[in-house]
C-alpha cells in the first residue's frame, strides 16, 4: 500500500492537440478537486469524464480540461486515478503539471504507475514487461508477442508448469511423511522419471518457440561480409532501396560498419555492412577488418557475398573457411552480368559446396532477392508463423529463468539415474518451481523490481 500521490505527463512532451497528465494515489481525486472548477470530482462515478477548468492559485483559469476519474480498485494502478486531458502545448502542459505538484502530490518516478499496478496485484511481472515491449515494438510481430504477454498467455504457461511441479513435490512429500498410510498413492522413481521427462519436453518446446520469438521481436543481427568490391554495400542499399552505404569501384571504400534495419515480411534484419577482408597496409582499413572479424562472434547470421562474375579469389576461400562453422548464407552477387565463373570455380574448390547452396542475386535489379528473403525465413523457421506461435516468451530474462528450470530437471534426471534417496528429488523440483516463479514476479528482490520499472517511460 502506498500513501503518497504521484503525477506525471503520460503523453510525449511536444505540441499537439491534447496532453494527458496522470495522477494516482488514494488522495488523487480529493487533491485534484481542490484546483478544479466544475462538478465535484469526489462525487463523480468511476470511469466518467467531467468537463471543467484547472485554476491557478489566484483562482484564475489556467486551462480548460476534461478529467477522467477511475476509482479504486477498478483502475490501472488499483488506486484512485485521475487523468487530466489538457491542451497539448509544451508550456501549458508544464504549467498544469506544476500546479498539480503544488498540492500534496509528487512527481512520479519512471515506470512508477506500472510498478504500483504490479505491486497492487493488477498485473503480473510478465504483463508489466509486455507494456514496455508494446511501447518499444519495431515491427508488427513484436506487437503481437507483447499483446500475448498482456493477455496472460505466457503467464498461463508458467502457471501450468508450476502446478505440475507442485503436484509432484506434494506427492513426494506425502510419501515421505506418511509412508504407513495404504490409501496414499505410492510414488515410484519410474513415475517421477516420467513426470520429469514430460516437464523437460515442455520446457524444451517453450525454449524453441521463445528463441524464435526473440528473432521476431528483436530482429536478426546480420553481418554482410566479403572481400572488397564484391558488392556488399550495393547489397545493403538494395535491401533498403536507398543509398545508405557508399558504393565505389575503389577497393576498401567501406572502412567501418554501416548499420541499417530492414523489415523482412514482418520481422527485422539488423544489417551490418562491414569492411572488406583482405591483406592491406592501410592502418585505418586494418582496424575495420579486425573489427569485422570480431563481429563474426556476435552475428546471428552471416551473408557471405561472392562475385558471381569472377573466379574464386584467395580472400574468398579464406572467408569460406572462416565462416564454415557459423550460421551463413552464401550469396553470388552480380548475376546480372551473366557469368558462370564463380560456379565453375566453386566446383573445383570443394565437393562439399554445391551451386545449389549459392543464392544468386543482383543488387542492381534485385533479381533473387525474393529467394534470398525466403531462405533467411526458412533458416530461422520464420516462414510459417501461426497465431499460437506468439504465445511464448521473447524476453531474455524470461528465457534465462526457463533455462535455469530446465537445468534443474536435467540435474534431477541424473539423480534418478543414480537412484538417490527420494527426498533429494524435492530440492531440484523446488529450484525449478522458484525459477519459474521469478518470471511472473514471485519472490523477486526489490532491487530487481526497481531496475525493471526504471526502464519505463515517465508517466507509465
From Swiss-Prot:
Binds 1 potassium ion per subunit. K(+) binds at residues 229, 248, 250, 253. It is an enzyme of class 3 (hydrolase). Mg(2+) binds at residues 233, 254. Its main location: cytoplasm. Its cofactor is K(+). Its EC number is 3.6.-.-. InterPro entries: G_TrmE, GTP-bd, GTP-bd_TrmE_N, GTPase_MnmE, MnmE_dom2, MnmE_helical, P-loop_NTPase, Small_GTP-bd. GO terms for biological process: tRNA methylation; tRNA wobble uridine modification. GO terms for cellular component: cytosol. Keywords: Cytoplasm, GTP-binding, Hydrolase, Magnesium, Metal-binding, Nucleotide-binding, Potassium, tRNA processing. SUPFAM superfamilies: P-loop containing nucleoside triphosphate hydrolases (SSF52540). GO terms for molecular function: GTP binding; GTPase activity; metal ion binding. Exhibits a very high intrinsic GTPase hydrolysis rate. Involved in the addition of a carboxymethylaminomethyl (cmnm) group at the wobble position (U34) of certain tRNAs, forming tRNA-cmnm(5)s(2)U34. Belongs to the TRAFAC class TrmE-Era-EngA-EngB-Septin-like GTPase superfamily. TrmE GTPase family. This is tRNA modification GTPase MnmE.
Amino acid at each position: 500500500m502506498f500513501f503518497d500521490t504521484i503525477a506525471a505527463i503520460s503523453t510525449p512532451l511536444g505540441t499537439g492537440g491534447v496532453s494527458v497528465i496522470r495522477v494516482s494515489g488514494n488522495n488523487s481525486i480529493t487533491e485534484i478537486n481542490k484546483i478544479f472548477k466544475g462538478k465535484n470530482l469526489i462525487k463523480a462515478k468511476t470511469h466518467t469524464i467531467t468537463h471543467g477548468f484547472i485554476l491557478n492559485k489566484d483562482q484564475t483559469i489556467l486551462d480548460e480540461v476534461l478529467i477522467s476519474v477511475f476509482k479504486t480498485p477498478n483502475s490501472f494502478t488499483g488506486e484512485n486515478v485521475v487523468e487530466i486531458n489538457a491542451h497539448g502545448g509544451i508550456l501549458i502542459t508544464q504549467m498544469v503539471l506544476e500546479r498539480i505538484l503544488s498540492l500534496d502530490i509528487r512527481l512520479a518516478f519512471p515506470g512508477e504507475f506500472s510498478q504500483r499496478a504490479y505491486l497492487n496485484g493488477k498485473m503480473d511481472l510478465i504483463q508489466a514487461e509486455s507494456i514496455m515491449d508494446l511501447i518499444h515494438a519495431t515491427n508488427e510481430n513484436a506487437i503481437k508477442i507483447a499483446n500475448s504477454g498482456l493477455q496472460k498467455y505466457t503467464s498461463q504457461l508458467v502457471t501450468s508448469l508450476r502446478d505440475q511441479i507442485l503436484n509432484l513435490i506434494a506427492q513426494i512429500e506425502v510419501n515421505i511423511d506418511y509412508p504407513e498410510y495404504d490409501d496414499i498413492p505410492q510414488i515410484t522413481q519410474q513415475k517421477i522419471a516420467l513426470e520429469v521427462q514430460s516437464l523437460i519436453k515442455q520446457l524444451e518446446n517453450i525454449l524453441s518457440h521463445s528463441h524464435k520469438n526473440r528473432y521476431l521481436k528483436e530482429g536478426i543481427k546480420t553481418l554482410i561480409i566479403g572481400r572488397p568490391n564484391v558488392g556488399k554495400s550495393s547489397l545493403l542499399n538494395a535491401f533498403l532501396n536507398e543509398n545508405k552505404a557508399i558504393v565505389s569501384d575503389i577497393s576498401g571504400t567501406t572502412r567501418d560498419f554501416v548499420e541499417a534495419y530492414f523489415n523482412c515480411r514482418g520481422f527485422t534484419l539488423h544489417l551490418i555492412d562491414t569492411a572488406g577482408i583482405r591483406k592491406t597496409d592501410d592502418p585505418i582499413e586494418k582496424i575495420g577488418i579486425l573489427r569485422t572479424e570480431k563481429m563474426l562472434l556476435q552475428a546471428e547470421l552471416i551473408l557471405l557475398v561472392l562475385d558471381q562474375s569472377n573466379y574464386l579469389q584467395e580472400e574468398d576461400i579464406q572467408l569460406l573457411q572462416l565462416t564454415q562453422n557459423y550460421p551463413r548464407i552464401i550469396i553470388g552477387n552480380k548475376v546480372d552480368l551473366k557469368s558462370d565463373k564463380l560456379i565453375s570455380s566453386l566446383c573445383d574448390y570443394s565437393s562439399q559446396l554445391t551451386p545449389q547452396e549459392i543464392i544468386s542475386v543482383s543488387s542492381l535489379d534485385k533479381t533473387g532477392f525474393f529467394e534470398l528473403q525466403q531462405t533467411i525465413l526458412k533458416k530461422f523457421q520464420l516462414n510459417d508463423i501461426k497465431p499460437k506461435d506468439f504465445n511464448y516468451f521473447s524476453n531474455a530474462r524470461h528465457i534465462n529463468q526457463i533455462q535455469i528450470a530446465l537445468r534443474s530437471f536435467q540435474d534431477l534426471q541424473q539423480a534418478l539415474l543414480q537412484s538417490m534417496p527420494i527426498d533429494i528429488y524435492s530440492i531440484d523440483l523446488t529450484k525449478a518451481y522458484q525459477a519459474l516463479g521469478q518470471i511472473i514476479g514471485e519472490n523477486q528482490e526489490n532491487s530487481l523490481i526497481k531496475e525493471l520499472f526504471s526502464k519505463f517511460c515517465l508517466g507509465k
